[in-house]
Regions:
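A beta-strand edge to alpha-helix "cap/lid" segment located at domain peripheries
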Residues: 1, 67-137
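Short, low-complexity N-terminal intrinsically disordered segments enriched in polar/charged residues
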Residues: 1-30, 137
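Hydrophobic pocket/interface hotspot
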Residues: 9, 24, 32, 55, ...
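Charged/polar, solvent-exposed surface patches and flexible loops
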Residues: 11, 26, 61, 65, ...
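Short, flexible active-site loop motifs that bind/organize anionic cofactors or intermediates
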Residues: 11-14, 49, 121
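Gly/Ser/Thr-rich helix-start
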Residues: 20, 56, 102
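A solvent-exposed, acidic/Ser-Thr-rich amphipathic alpha-helical stretch
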Residues: 29-84
Length: 137
């Protein structure tokens, strides 16, 4: 199962890198949950992404918000690890918030839970503070 999950995960990153959001969504379950909340999550924070996103419509909203508020400078998954139902990616990303012109970068770990070849849960771990500061004027 872990080899199959790694193959799915590779497809997801390829779709994201190519800007193929419908293709990326095709690997998400209907009950998908993306947990993009920081440790100090507060509703209405300066970061419009900091939220719990549910369902494909929520993921679409997240992706639209991400792609209209930030530019990708670098997005590099470096290592992947898998077990029966999870895949973890370790990597580095570098972004620019369009409105403020501020850049931020961070190493990341992303934990994906899969069921029957579809992602049911996603949780990134990175420097949320750096991202939040980049959104501030």
């Amino acid at each position: 199962m872990s080899d199959r999950n790694l193959a799915v995960f590779t497809q997801i990153f390829e779709r994201f890198s190519a800007g193929d959001m419908p293709g990326l969504l095709s690997f998400q379950s209907d009950e998908i949950v993306w947990d993009y909340r920081s440790e100090d999550f507060t509703e209405g924070m300066d970061n419009p992404l900091n939220n719990l996103w549910k369902g494909k419509s929520g993921i679409t909203q997240f992706l639209n918000t991400l792609l209209t508020t930030q530019e990708v400078i670098e997005f590099e998954p470096r290592d992947f690890f898998a077990n029966e139902d999870q895949v973890v990616a370790i990597g580095h990303s570098h972004w620019k918030v369009i409105e403020t012109g501020k850049e931020w970068a961070s190493d990341f770990a992303m934990v994906f839970t899969l069921k029957e070849g579809l992602v049911t849960h996603w949780r990134p771990i990175f420097d949320y503070t750096a991202e939040r500061i980049a959104y501030q004027s």
